[in-house]
From Swiss-Prot:
The protein's name: Ubiquitin-like domain-containing CTD phosphatase 1
PANTHER family assigned to the protein according to its UniProt record, in alphabetical order: UBIQUITIN-LIKE DOMAIN-CONTAINING CTD PHOSPHATASE 1
GO terms under cellular component: nucleus
Protein role: Dephosphorylates 26S nuclear proteasomes, thereby decreasing their proteolytic activity. Recruited to the 19S regulatory particle of the 26S proteasome where it dephosphorylates 19S component Rpt1 which impairs Rpt1 ATPase activity and disrupts 26S proteasome assembly.
Cofactor(s) for this UniProt protein: Mg(2+)
Gene Ontology MF term list: metal ion binding; protein serine/threonine phosphatase activity
UniProt gene name: Ublcp1
Amino acid sequence: MEVKEVVVIVKWSGKEYPVDLTDQDTVEVLRHEIFRKTQVRPERQKLLNLKYKGKTAADNVKISALELKPNFKLMMVGSTEADIEDACSLPDNIGEVVDDFDDADEREESVEHSAVYLAKVQRRVRDYKIKELAPPREGKKLLVLDIDYTLFDHRSPAETGTELMRPYLHEFLTSAYEDYDIVIWSATSMRWIEEKMRLLGVASNDNYKVMFYLDSTAMISVHVPERGVVDVKPLGVIWALYKQYNSSNTIMFDDIRRNFLMNPKSGLKIRPFRQAHLNRGTDTELLKLSDYLRKIAHHCPDFNSLNHRKWEHYHPKKNS
């Protein structure tokens, strides 16, 4: 199936926002991408001139069926939550509530090999600009790390960033750096990633180096039955730009399993670090994971053979 790229120009609040899609995406995906650009939630968007057979296009209609002209300009009306005084605020952990896929192997497989989503990955490879902070090192494996709730409790109040840092963070990164090049990938803006890395002392630590940061714009949106549209972190973006890394030598940590949908075998769901003030004294997750990373780096030549859901039970003699 040939997948064609489509650009829709959304006109809203006096500005224009280009939205990159494929012709196999649906109106629901379009709304999700508009939300990423404008922060106007899909249910609040009124797409004035998006028609299908003379009527307002339903969410399940494919972009290809709309027969849009190149650089079609879409008129939108809608308000952000911040602009609606009586709007109910969303729960802080709404993402974590709805996005676990613990029993979703078939769904993962269908997403991973979808031509539509692979085309989106290729677009990220083409358009995303990586700012390299440290060069890759020969013979090293790749560790990709989330930030929020993985390395850092970003919701609890504190005087300093170190109060919210997951215990043993610097020891973990120092140990991992012996065998892995390290990449930070967060579903936030680059400005916030850089600020958090500065606050945590990661950016300035002499014992290890982060190769580069990836932000939310390197992610892609996928449609999952019964879940709707979600954003995921496709490792193919990194693998295409750095050929020495692939599924055999890459592992990614995140507290949200849906981020692994494009690369389910490469992801390890870490226990989220919340309520830092209560859990700082007992959280040893990073210490245990340091041991796991070291063992698989030294004893497992192909990470595809691993089941990261059972990482706590890995024994080199039995698994290598």
